[in-house]
């Protein structure tokens, strides 16, 4: 595991984008595992900037996203498909037929999850998986207590996650209560993992994930067992470690 300290969010985003762009340059037809939320927005902006300068070519890249809210379609502005289109896909020369997000409108969880596992397998797995870190150590929607051996599955969102998300919706009743997410097993099968974390509110989760016991109560702690993990975090997130 390699840990890089970033001066601030902009520096964190640039460092993360450097690693992703190197992956694309080294393997133009690579499979990228992508994340949503506030953490990777700056990374995606930097990738778009380099694409606009002619430094990056996404035409052969495949992307597979971590998760999606169950019941939200791609045109819903709170869906993760919409987020990815808005923050990355609409701004680069990627073939959207090669961008995958779980089907939030598939009502049958077994069908949705089996289909997504097959998408990952049929593309030969993920070359580089980008991850954010939840305040409770969650990765994707794998909340504390999630079994390490699970593949893509349907999860009931915790009260804390629903609470954190309600600011994005008109009312709490509109907040999805379930999501489809890649499991820990899918994530751990990625060839490389890039974990980004910023802010003092992530400090305890980052410390527990990197140096605490490996336990389902801190889902990201399993990353200690992966043989190629890069962590990029700012000074605030690293305050309990460095």
Predicted regions span which residues?
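Glycine-rich N-terminal segment of FAD-binding domains in flavoprotein oxidoreductases
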Residues: 26-52
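Ligand-binding beta-strand-loop-alpha-helix segment within the catalytic cores
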Residues: 56-129
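ATP/nucleoside-binding phosphotransfer catalytic cores, i.e., glycine-rich phosphate-binding loops
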Residues: 185, 189-242
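A glycine- and small-aliphatic-rich helix-loop capping segment at beta-alpha/alpha-beta transitions
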Residues: 46-57, 80, 144-153, 212-214
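Class I SAM-dependent methyltransferase SAM-binding "motif I" and its flanking Rossmann-like core
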Residues: 140-184
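Short beta-strand segments
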Residues: 33-37, 65, 102-103, 130-133, ...
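Glycine-rich phosphate-binding loop
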Residues: 124-150
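N-terminal glycine-/serine-/threonine-rich phosphate-binding loop
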Residues: 1-32
């Amino acid at each position: 595991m390699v840990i890089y300290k970033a001066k601030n969010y902009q520096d964190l985003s640039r460092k993360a984008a450097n690693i992703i762009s190197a992956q694309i340059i080294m393997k133009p037809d690579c499979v990228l595992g992508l994340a949503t939320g506030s953490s990777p927005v700056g990374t995606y902006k930097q990738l778009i900037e380099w694409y606009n300068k002619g430094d990056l070519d996404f035409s052969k890249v495949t992307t597979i996203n971590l998760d999606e809210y169950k019941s939200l379609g791609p045109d819903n502005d709170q869906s993760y498909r919409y987020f990815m289109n808005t923050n990355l896909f609409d701004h680069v020369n990627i073939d959207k037929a090669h961008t995958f997000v779980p089907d939030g409108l598939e009502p049958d969880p077994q069908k949705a999850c089996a289909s997504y596992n097959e998408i990952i397998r049929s593309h030969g797995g993920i070359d580089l998986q980008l991850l954010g870190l939840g305040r409770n150590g969650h990765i994707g929607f794998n909340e504390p207590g999630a079994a390490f051996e699970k593949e893509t599955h349907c999860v009931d969102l915790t009260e804390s996650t629903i609470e954190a998300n309600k600011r994005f919706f008109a009312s709490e009743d509109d907040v999805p209560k379930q999501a489809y997410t890649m499991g820990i097993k899918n994530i751990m099968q990625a060839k490389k993992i890039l974990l980004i974390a910023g802010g003092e509110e992530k400090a305890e989760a980052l410390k527990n994930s990197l140096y605490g016991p490996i336990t389902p109560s801190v889902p990201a702690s399993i990353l200690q067992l992966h043989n190629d993990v890069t962590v990029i975090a700012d000074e605030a997130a690293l305050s309990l470690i460095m």
